[in-house]
Amino acid sequence: MSDQEAKPSTEDLGDKKEGEYIKLKVIGQDSSEIHFKVKMTTHLKKLKESYCQRQGVPMNSLRFLFEGQRIADNHTPKELGMEEEDVIEVYHEQTGGHSTV
């Protein structure tokens, strides 16, 4: 297991209150865990990009879920009500699935 920090975006740099960072666990389909320390106001796109880069896969090939809801690039931990040690689940995107009648 390793810790990696998703760097805050430039609009987040002005707000440096204590306790603004939380640790999140990202768990893949293979049960692998990667821990991230993120600011409550950072867009989760940064975490998603960092995870995909570490896994060596394109971002559009995965979907990220928190409490069963898909995470949009512009969501923040604060908007989603995330807390310390919350879990983000990662699944491979599936396309197709039409019936052949």
UniProtKB/Swiss-Prot annotation:
Q: Which family does it belong to?
A: Belongs to the ubiquitin family. SUMO subfamily.
Question: Site positions for Interaction with PIAS2, renumbered to this chain?
Answer: 36
Glycyl lysine isopeptide (Lys-Gly) (interchain with G-Cter in SUMO2) crosslink site(s):
7, 16-17, 23, 37, 39, 45-46
Swiss-Prot/TrEMBL GO biological process terms:
cellular response to cadmium ion; cellular response to heat; negative regulation of action potential; negative regulation of delayed rectifier potassium channel activity; protein sumoylation; roof of mouth development
List residues of the Ubiquitin-like domain.
Answer: 20-97
Mod. after translation: Cleavage of precursor form by SENP1, SENP2 is necessary for function.
**Principal place of residence:** nucleus
Q: Which residues form the propeptide?
A: 98-101
Q: Which UniProt keywords apply?
A: Acetylation, Cell membrane, Cytoplasm, Isopeptide bond, Membrane, Nucleus, Phosphoprotein, Ubl conjugation, Ubl conjugation pathway
- Give the quaternary structure: Covalently attached to KCNB1; UBE2I increases cross-linking with KCNB1 and PIAS1 decreases cross-links with KCNB1. Interacts with SAE2, RANBP2, PIAS1 and PIAS2. Interacts with PRKN. Covalently attached to a number of proteins such as IKFZ1, PML, RANGAP1, HIPK2, SP100, p53, p73-alpha, MDM2, JUN, DNMT3B and TDG. Also interacts with HIF1A, HIPK2, HIPK3, CHD3, EXOSC9, RAD51 and RAD52. Interacts with USP25 (via ts SIM domain); the interaction weakly sumoylates USP25. Interacts with SIMC1, CASP8AP2, RNF111 and SOBP (via SIM domains). Interacts with BHLHE40/DEC1. Interacts with RWDD3.
Annotated Gene Ontology MF terms? potassium channel regulator activity; transcription factor binding; ubiquitin protein ligase binding
User: What is this organism's lineage?
Assistant: Eukaryota, Metazoa, Chordata, Craniata, Vertebrata
> Where in the cell does this protein reside?
Nucleus membrane; Nucleus speckle; Cytoplasm; Nucleus, PML body
Q: Which residues carry this modification: Phosphoserine?
A: 2, 9, 32
Residues with the modification N-acetylserine, per the entry, are: 2
Sorted alphabetically, which InterPro entries does this protein's record hold?
Answer: Rad60/SUMO-like_dom, SUMO1_Ubl, Ubiquitin-like_dom, Ubiquitin-like_domsf
* Organism of derivation: Cervus nippon
Q: Name the encoding gene, please.
A: SUMO1
What is the name listed in the Swiss-Prot or TrEMBL entry for this protein? Small ubiquitin-related modifier 1
Q: Which GO terms describe its cellular component?
A: cytoplasm; nuclear membrane; nuclear speck; nuclear stress granule; plasma membrane; PML body
| Site of covalent link Glycyl lysine isopeptide (Lys-Gly) (interchain with G-Cter in SUMO1) | 7, 25
Q: Where is this cross-link: Glycyl lysine isopeptide (Gly-Lys) (interchain with K-? in acceptor proteins)?
A: 97
